[in-house]
């Protein structure tokens, strides 16, 4: 039996991770957050705020875990630098301190972002130094979200170097899936357009643009693989789909699912902003034996099935949710 703590389990990837962990026979899953998560998540909820060091320690006193997954971060730049640092950096450090003092802990998995390299939709796109972008690519963050994500990585890996805390870092690209909470909240608007079935805006600024996405299910599964593989500690891995996708390919996949739907560019954000960006997943394949399972067609079919199954009506709107830190978690 594996005992797992998911910090940020009420967010977008966190909810899917909780579901996957809970589906494993005999595993015990706890979810830590400030407010009880909306919906029916199969995990024991622990009330705590990661930004409050002593109350966090008190909430976890006497508890032992095999794995801690840390997904509790602000899902974008809030415009409040102190809040960004308090949640993303101070909150993470509190969790790392507790993990360091937990004798039976076997892995601490940090959910980071490709924004640690620099790319963030609200910042003007700058082409990579080379492509596909691997984990050795220079990091050049210039906005508070990207800077705090890179700083998270450095802080977490310092605990690995100094204290031998078995930390693994995953750099997630844009994650596509149903529900659309936290870092995936924009996908709920996309799902609404799919539900209407007339016109849908896709997250590209042009049909020629090339971006790299990952299915929500693959993103969660890679967290589990990173928690279990002996070669993962001390490493950073890209967490992306097997292949990049152009606007034309994205549109064609949608039209196969929804014949006759009008597909246009102009979604509120785009990863490459009309340019091209591709990531390299060879390190995850070679060191972790991890290969993403779902292509863009599979992912969009999954979102559509959720919509047609009443997902929009069943799932709380993210605007009404409160996450682990008082704001939406990733």
PLM regions and their residue ranges:
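Active-site Tyr-X1-5-Lys
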Residues: 140-168
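Conserved C-terminal active-site "lid" loop/helix of NAD(P)H-dependent oxidoreductases
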Residues: 216, 248, 269-291, 312-314
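Glycine/proline-rich active-site loop of Rossmann-fold NAD(P)-dependent oxidoreductases
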Residues: 150, 163-165, 176-189, 216-217, ...
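Mid/C-terminal beta-alpha module of Rossmann-like enzyme folds, strongest
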Residues: 222-270, 314-315, 320, 326-330
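NAD(P)H-binding glycine-rich loop region in Rossmannoid oxidoreductase-like domains
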Residues: 47-87
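Conserved Rossmann-fold NAD(P)-dependent oxidoreductase catalytic core, especially the SDR/UDP-sugar
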Residues: 94-143
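NAD(P)-dependent short-chain dehydrogenase/reductase
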Residues: 123, 157-210, 254
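N-terminal Rossmann NAD(P)H-binding glycine-rich loop of SDR-like oxidoreductase domains
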Residues: 4-24
